[in-house]
Amino acid sequence: AADAKGLLKMACRMDDPVIFMEHKGLYRQGYAATEEPDADYLLSFGKGRKVLEGDELTVITWGAMVQKSLEAVQSLEIQNDSVEVIDLRTLNPLDMDLIETSIMKTSKALVVHEDNITNGPGAEIAAIIADKFFELLDGPVRRVGAKDSPVPFNWIIEEEILPQTVD
């Protein structure tokens, strides 16, 4: 909640056009509630945050997929220090310094997003990572995303299309 407030307040102060999108799935989620740092809290665009420290795999994600990624790491019962999870917070600009620092450490990248696996923002982020950090990678950038289908209105079918913790 603090991130959303800080980003929205920053967007209101910008002279440029801004598209601010919130994920409805984060509303009323206990894990999304945070204390307000202070009334004047601002969060700069292009500044991600490291949510989980690790040294074998970098998971690059944002929005509701941050929590799903953390749940996936916990459900795999792997060493806590093997997966690094990065919350981008903003897609444009990207926090390239944070991404590079993490990939330098892990040499592997997995982009997790809720949009279609084909032509979604994760595909573009994976392409940017492959272009800029090819020499740092031990293999191809992998992606987890929604099945290539329109997202249905029925929540049961929606869960079949959108990425889940087990994916």
Q: Positions of the model-derived regions?
A:
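Residue-level detector of structured alpha->beta connecting loops
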Residues: D15-D16, S107
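Conserved thiamine diphosphate
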Residues: A1-M14
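Thiamine diphosphate
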Residues: K24-D167
